[in-house]
A protein has these predicted regions:
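Pocket-forming structural segment of enzyme catalytic cores
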Residues: 43-128
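Glycine-rich, phosphate-binding/catalytic loops in enzymes
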Residues: 11-15, 47-48, 99-100, 134-136
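Short amphipathic alpha-helical segments and helix-helix/interface helices
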Residues: 12, 16-20, 72, 174, ...
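Flexible gly/pro-rich beta->alpha loop and the following alpha-helix that scaffold active-site loops
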Residues: 1-30
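Catalytic nucleophile loop
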Residues: 22-46
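Generic recognition of short, well-ordered alpha-helical segments
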Residues: 7-13, 34, 42, 93-94, ...
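Acyltransferase
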Residues: 126-185
């Protein structure tokens, strides 16, 4: 499923309308991966294929704007977070870039004070990743061919090293997200 694919517009257009309504009412919005792409497109930004599968634990960098953002403040500038996506997006007009990456630059952004998009999958744990590896085998083979087994092994090695730190990031952002929702709702 891709926000860049017009075939899914009958599903996505009502969601994007709801996202805009929430934003206009200052109700917090948090989009992760597909959700970040929907948020970007809701504000007329382009969503398009990355021409690669960004998969595995990836170094991401909190920007100057991110350092002072209420969800990210207090975190180390460099984070290693799980990724599994093949699309990316331009930033909507007026959005603040909060996190960036090397192969997919736009990793997290905020529009206004309550609408957030995260391209990375900070919400997943080892259990989720195991399922995604099994169910996403076709993607791994499509993008990596005979190297798919090595990519899978790399992901599993990375998991043992990074899943704990990634979980801390998730709890940090999640706690602050709950605070934001409590303030606004």
């Amino acid at each position: 499923m891709s926000v860049a694919n017009p075939e899914f517009d009958p599903v996505f257009k009502p969601l994007m309308k709801l996202i805009r309504e929430f934003h206009e009412d200052q109700k917090p919005v948090l989009g992760v991966c597909l959700g970040s792409q929907l948020l970007a497109r809701s504000f007329d930004a382009e969503v398009y294929p990355l021409n690669d599968l960004e998969v595995g634990y990836t170094p991401l960098y909190i920007t100057e704007s991110g350092v002072t953002d209420s969800l990210l403040t207090g975190l180390s500038r460099r984070q290693t977070i799980f990724e599994w996506h093949e699309d990316t997006f331009d930033l909507p007009n007026g959005a603040e870039l909060l996190m960036s990456g090397d192969s997919c630059y736009h990793q997290a952004f905020r529009i206004g004070s309550t609408s957030y998009g995260f391209q990375c999958h900070f919400e997943v744990d080892a259990r989720h990743i195991d399922v995604w590896i099994k169910e996403g085998r076709e993607d791994l083979v499509h993008y990596h061919g005979t190297g798919a087994d090595e990519v899978e092994r790399d992901i599993r090695r990375q998991m043992t090293r990074h899943v704990g730190l990634s979980s801390r990031f998730a709890y940090h952002v999640g706690d602050r997200w709950i605070d934001l929702v409590s303030e606004r709702c």
